[in-house]
Amino acid sequence: MSLWPFLGKHPRYREHGLLERLCEPDRVIQFRVAWVDDKGQTQVNRAFRVQHNMAIGPYKGGMRFHPSVNLSILKFLGFEQTFKNALTTLPMGGGKGGSDFDPKGKSDGEVMRFCQALMSELYRHLGADTDVPAGDIGVGAREVGFMAGMMKKLSNNAGSVFTGKGIAYGGSLMRPEATGYGTVYFAQEMLRRKQMGFEDRRVSISGSGNVAQYAADKAMELGAKVVTLSDSDGTLVCEGGLTHGMLQDLMEFKNVQRGRLKDFCKQHKLKFEAGKRPWHVPVDIALPCATQNELDAADAKHLIANGVVCVAEGANMPSTLEAVEHFLAAGTLYAPGKASNAGGVATSGLEMSQNAMRLSWTHSEVDLRLHEIMKDIHGNCVRHGERKDGTVNYVEGANVAGFVKIADAMLAQGVC
């Protein structure tokens, strides 16, 4: 674990049991959710909210609706979220929640009734200065809207506790772009430190959803050639690089028509490699933006052999532990997701600030603040991860930077 050497040099953290205290959440809320489906049958699901740590601010983290959700997963995600939020430099603690409810195949009415039933219990544990949830897997704008609406109804308070809301009721501009843009901003800082940039670089991106789309958009804006996107069916390969027109068409096709990438490739006469991931294509920069454990040791070896310079994670933990070890051993610039994809939660923090001030910032204002936050995160990673030879272990840097921020706050507040 990258924290052990640091803890060995700074015994005061060990003397006060900071790591042990961080490994256990402040509290766990678990309850049943009973709701009625379209056939009039009563359904029962389990729901959880892990309030992990609020040493530096209110609990902050997404709600996940997926059959795989259980307490063990959410406790781990809450732990990771605490470190990620600390890296943003914004006053946010860490938390995570969700349910084993599966929104796939459910009608809008069923999803609404479930969200309202869930909030009838959860609302009493939330608040702008207590716990601020957001979306995650299975929880998009629709679900956030249903939950936020029920929260207002039950609390008789117009304060919008959720982030990721629609613009019409307190959401922030730039929230859809934030994670993808932030990933590219972080990679840009990594490259700049080595006197390099995105211009004329070949970039491989996995995924074709929100994060991948906006990572591609920003990389192209910086002069890069985006040569791949992917989905669960396979990989789009465009050796000459996607154009802005192609990307706009793809956004329409994926976000509005809900189409598959292979069908988009047929329409635009683009190469589609069925069943393949994008990491075999020679590139300078790789941005895994799809899902967990999508890039394994064999993929890492392919990328390294083909001369990859930089890997920055847009998804949460897309690289396996073995893949990360290969990148670090090869001296590849590698950014873990808790640092490079923190732009999403950072912009959620900016949404909280706008709500508190009853203001709405412009697109350019939010983008500028996001860019500065990603620069600050990079600087903190360098500060805590730089080696004597000038290289930077961004994994160690991110873990130590996040830990120090939380641990110092906990030390100042005593044993509680």
Task: Show which residues each predicted segment covers.
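Buried hydrophobic packing segments
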Residues: 74-77, 147, 183-191, 215, ...
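Short acidic, glycine/serine/threonine-rich loops at helix termini
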Residues: 110, 142-149, 173, 214-218, ...
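N-terminal ligand-binding/catalytic initiation module
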Residues: 1-174, 408-413
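Glycine-rich phosphate/diphosphate-binding loop of Rossmann-like nucleotide-binding domains
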Residues: 163-166, 171-282
